Amino acid sequence: IARPTEALSLSAGAFYSDPALNQTTANGTEFGISGSAGYFVIGEVAYRLNPEKGDTGLPGRYRAGGYYDSNQYAFLDNPGRQQMGNYGLFLLGEQMVYREGGPGSNQGLTVFGGLIYAPQQRINTLPWFASAGATYRGLVPGRDEDAAIFALYYGGFSRDLPGQTYELVLEWAYAMAVTRWLTVQPDLQYVINPGGRSSVGNAVVVGAQLAVEF
């Protein structure tokens, strides 16, 4: 990670990437690198708006970057054919638009969004993925650390997958800070076009998350 200024940062990483790790028949301990393994590299530039705790302006963070994976990928419409390498680009951002209290307060309304684009349609199930939403921290009086969340997620399927168009998910959640170290978050999702198929009925998904901070 490099930080040319307090607001601007550059980061990159390189990782060992082995598709064989997904095989359910693999077991035991293995520290070697298989001949089928490749590498995954990712980099991003990030800009923070009003990053200091005492800044009077509303904070925000914006990121742009890309990635490359050197492994072999099968064609979606012909699994017998493969190509080497896959890449994508991403844009992510979050910005507080309303704040309760003075500078440094984390209570208020923050909006966020993201876009991921993997242009090679023949090997990427979801070449397009977009998300947007909002979080309001301290919406309920007396619950300053709770957060009400609404988000939507859109995935556009590859044109090489006939019958699959898009999937849209609407999500509502409420993160309750039970203690300083325990957060409980019930979650409700409504899934439109599950799996990208209009022939499949829309679905309601109910869940919850439990977070413990040590």
Which residues fall in each region the model found?
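Outer-membrane beta-barrel "beta-signal"
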Residues: 202-214
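Transmembrane beta-barrel strands of outer-membrane/channel proteins
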Residues: 10-16, 62-70, 109-117, 130-132, ...
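Membrane-embedded beta-strand positions in outer-membrane beta-barrel channels/transporters
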Residues: 1, 42-44, 90-92, 131-133, ...
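Aromatic- and glycine-enriched pocket-lining scaffold segments that form the walls
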Residues: 1-44
